[in-house]
Amino acid sequence: MINKKISLGVLSILTAFSLQSVSYACTGFIIGKDLTKDGSLLYGRTEDLEPHHNKNFIVRLAKDNPAGEKWKDLSNGFEYPLPEHSYRYSAIPDVTPNKGVYDEAGFNECGVSMSATVSASANDAIQKIDPYVKNGLAESSMASVILPSVKTAREGVALIAKIVTEKGAAEGNIVTLADKDGIWYMEILSGHQYVAIKFPDDKYAVFPNTFYLGHVDFNDKENTIASEDVEKVAKKAKSYIEVDGKFHIAKSYNPPLNDANRSRSFSGIKSLDPDSKVTYKDSNYELLQSTDKTFSLEDAMKLQRNRFEGLDLKPLDQMALDGKGKPKSKKAVKGYAYPISNPNVMEAHIFQLKKDIPAELGGGVMWLSIGSPRNAPYLPYLGNISRTYEAYQEKSTQYNDKSWYWTVSHINDLVAAHPKPFGTKVIDEMKGLEKTWIAEQDKSTKEISDLVVSDPKAAQEKADKISLDRAEKTFKRLKAIEAKLVEEKPKNKKGLNRS
């Protein structure tokens, strides 16, 4: 057993981050199917809040609910009636449900996938007119209420719209839902205002914690779902802005772009398309980005691991290591910025949706890294699994050597604290594993897809076995890497190992 102790060096890095004015820091992305090398739709998110925040990966089984039973969010008092029957779905919850469940992302048994949410906030003028509702719908409840209740992505968007209209939103959020017909991108703008669009197949997007929608055709009911008063509220708040004679949602609802959102928007776009004309000084970044390039799953993984490679910026968390002291709140430091891959990442997920994968399997694969993928691998999971590996289910709020999250967290801490001796050895091995799994995944998915038609139960058992075996082998390897890093880390002047 390895005793988990964090060195002063690591603590100084994490403390530096806590001093930043980044109260939430998820980064989402979408790559339309016309822009991928294999025709798959790619979308996902890094879930960011703070270091050392345990996440689980579980499956919530289908169930019938008694009449009148409600979902209750203990973190803010939100309640909503449960459906007569809840569909099975996978989830990535927190381990402190009294502070919010935060199921975050997963597939349901109907082939709907969801990532919820990228937090955002309307400007002060908007909030005075349509304030957020304390016990309204929040990220903490989003996936838990929607995934067990809907058969299509559009139904999911419509249900969110209904709840926000009737009960209000507790906060601003960006939500993505997808199925065999494509992906919806939704912005919950203020207490009762929202806009959702069917995302175009020939565009890509990178979206950290601010709103991005520009002009939307509200008359296009097939591809748009919006609240009735979204323009009226902006006009009443005197924050209404037009671009080229048309209402611009983001410019009307957003506060000024902050440095953390600027750095992640810019670096994310540049990660996917180095030839993009965006600059670090742009006043805003459009949601729908165009390119003549095509992308792979590995490009999406690279995006979520981005730390300004190839750009004239350094990650903010390196400041303590570089001897420049702790960053001061709300004060930019030249040359340093907030990266997509940062110490606050608690998990990262990528949905890879393909037309030839049945809805019973989720219509695709979720590639998941519990813990930051900076030095950990993405593992593939189909949407029909019924259980997950035991290391994903440890609920400790402190280091636990049986926990996937805490093991990865420790590995990341060790590599961050000792970059010179450890270098890229760990991540290089992780990328090698991912390359093998990507090559294997099409074959195993085809076999399970063929089986699900004749024997859904056998298909589920096979998907379970493959994913459980892979997770068990990978976790054993992660434990071996963790032990080796502890053994090889530099000693201090007294000859003692520094954790």
From Swiss-Prot:
InterPro entries: C69_dipept_A-like (IPR047804), Peptidase_C69 (IPR005322). Its EC number is 3.4.13.19. Keywords: Dipeptidase, Hydrolase, Protease. Pfam families: Peptidase_C69. Belongs to the peptidase C69 family. GO terms for biological process: proteolysis. Coiled coil: none annotated. It catalyses: an L-aminoacyl-L-amino acid + H2O = 2 an L-alpha-amino acid. One of its GO terms (molecular function) is cysteine-type exopeptidase activity. The active site is at residue 26. The lineage of its organism: Bacteria, Bacillati, Bacillota, Bacilli, Lactobacillales. This is Probable dipeptidase B.
